């Protein structure tokens, strides 16, 4: 009997990348996801970001939210946008929504925010460095789960947070943070995949936000490079996907946004 090995090996690995990563490391597979214009802006100089991409790209994002276990943002995103972070696909119920994770080192998330008010219906985790149980209680009573991490540069220790999430059985996280949290995730070396939705628009603006902020790199040679890149057309927009060649751990201070 003749046996052929490694048939469609790369395709199978890609299809099961979350499972393989979680089984080998017991840590979530983290996808850094953002939408930007052709000139690299995630919002206008006024902060307006609805919508950067078109309907096809946004529908793809919600299919991703339906597929992966959790979605994570920083408290800055909650304060700026008051998002629900749900899966808005036709025919889906609350059970299809991802677990929502907020990185909030000092517990600034408003109790009246949509996320906290819906925490009893949709699983919600607040990751914080604040150890004051009295400050935890209003969130717990609202239905949130509190995870306390060590403090790293004044912010949530993302590596420790991933360890705790893995222990809870969360095998995958879509990171939809702002530029500072995205930089922190790259700095912590927790990102396994990058998904950039690129719109056929130009926003301009010196003060307009970009997908990755923080300190930045000194030279192009220091940059995080992606391998196994793939480009997919989504209506008038594009999805560019790739995998960081190596984890960078000396990239400046951690931040949340």
Regions found by a protein language model. Give the residues of each.
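Conserved histidine-centered catalytic loops in small-molecule metabolism enzymes
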Residues: 131, 214-257
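Short gly/pro/ser/thr-enriched loop/turn and capping motifs at secondary-structure boundaries
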Residues: 10-11, 79, 108-110, 133-134, ...
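Short, loop-centered acidic/histidine patches that primarily coordinate divalent metals
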Residues: 178, 197-200, 234
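Flexible, gly/pro- and Lys/Arg-enriched active-site loops
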Residues: 187-226
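Active-site-proximal cofactor/substrate-binding loop regions of enzyme domains
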Residues: 1-6
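A short acidic, often aromatic-flanked loop/helix-cap motif at beta-alpha or helix-coil junctions
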Residues: 8-14, 108, 152-157, 235-239
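Active-site ligand-binding patch in enzyme domains
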Residues: 17-38, 42-171, 180-183, 253, ...
């Amino acid at each position: 009997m003749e046996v052929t090995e490694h048939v469609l090996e790369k395709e199978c690995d890609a299809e099961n990348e979350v499972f393989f990563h979680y089984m080998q490391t017991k840590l979530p597979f983290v996808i850094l996801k953002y939408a930007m214009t052709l000139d690299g802006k995630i919002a206008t100089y006024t902060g307006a970001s609805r919508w950067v991409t078109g309907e096809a790209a946004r529908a793809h994002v919600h299919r991703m939210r339906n597929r992966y276990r959790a979605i994570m943002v920083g408290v800055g995103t909650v304060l700026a946008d008051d998002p629900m972070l749900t899966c808005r696909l036709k025919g889906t119920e609350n059970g299809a929504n991802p677990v929502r994770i907020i990185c909030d080192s000092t517990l600034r998330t408003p109790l009246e925010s949509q996320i906290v008010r819906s925490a009893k219906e949709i699983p919600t985790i607040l990751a914080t460095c604040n150890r004051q149980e009295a400050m935890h209680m209003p969130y717990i009573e609202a239905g949130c789960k509190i995870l306390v991490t060590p403090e790293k540069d004044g912010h949530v220790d993302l590596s420790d947070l991933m360890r705790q999430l893995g222990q809870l059985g969360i095998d995958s996280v879509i990171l939809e943070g702002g530029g500072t949290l995205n930089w922190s995730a790259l700095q912590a070396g927790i990102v396994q995949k990058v998904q950039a939705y690129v719109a056929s628009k130009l926003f301009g603006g010196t003060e307009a936000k970009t997908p990755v902020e923080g300190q930045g790199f000194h030279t192009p040679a220091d940059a995080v490079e992606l391998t196994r890149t793939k480009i997919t057309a989504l209506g008038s927009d594009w999805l560019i996907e790739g995998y960081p060649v190596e984890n960078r751990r000396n990239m400046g201070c951690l931040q949340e946004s």
